[in-house]
Amino acid sequence: MPYQSIFRPGLFGGQSILVTGGGSGIGRCTAHELAALGARVALVGRKREKLETVQREIAEATGDANTATIHVCDIREEETVKATVAAVLAAHGRIDGLVNNAGGQFPAPLKDISGKGWDAVVRNNLTGCFLMSREVYNQTMAAKGGAIVNMLADIWMGMPGMGHSGASRGGILNFTETAAIEWAPVRINAVAPGLIASSGLDTYDEPFKKSIRERYKQIPAGRYGTESEVSAAIVYLLSPAAAFISGVALRIDGAVPHAKRIWPHTGNGSKSPAFDGFHLASFPEVLRDVAAK
């Protein structure tokens, strides 16, 4: 019998994966990737229209209208999260994996962030991740096992201009490490994207966009990352290939944390080859000129 790689067609066949923030960006890309590998996907988010669009895309791609279900949910609301997880279980019969992708933030220096603004970001990122994880664990994974992947950011040297997001993502990192112990053998991991060319970059104000256009010079890989590269890391951590990996944060950042001032990055004019497999991804307009360089 010929050897069959773990990275094979139908890798997630028979499994059900819940993806929060599944209506756009990395969540949308991850949902497509999982569906292409045989999973049924539960798309969770606040905006029904976005979820319905992704549901149609997946149905067209797979030829099966039942591959993806949609569930409108505000992950910050405890009772709503409980009901949503129960609804996914009723529709799918199981939840084998959870991708806590949903979140959000806005650029602002710490001195200008109001208490309301701080709470909004912490609830969106940290509280939502906790509530969704707890409910999936309590309602199914405690008895049947599974894997959870959380969303971080490049938080290790601070996040000037987004301190509320850095604090909440730091909380998610500690939650990931703690849950990996308390909830074992359920596997709990996280991904930490660095500078990613996501369509969400276009929503920021012009001063922040200007800094975004310059920051690629700090990346040893010579370019921004892609949504596909983040979703590929998420899928890996959900897969049997990562069966002995738990409590870790996988950085997807082109070696930015290791760039040293004593060894300046000259880049010799070259870029690392990108994996940009998601054909429906929207490249941010703010980076069009940068990509052409």
What are these regions (language model features)?
Residues N138, I181-A184, A243:
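Alpha-helical segment proximal to the catalytic Tyr-Lys
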Residues V99, A184-R187, I245-G247:
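Short, small/polar-rich loop/turn modules that mediate ligand/substrate recognition or access, typified
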Residues P109-L110, S114-V122, R215:
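Substrate-binding pocket helix/loop in short-chain dehydrogenase/reductase
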Residues G93, F130, R223-I252, P257:
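C-terminal substrate-recognition "lid" of short-chain dehydrogenase/reductases
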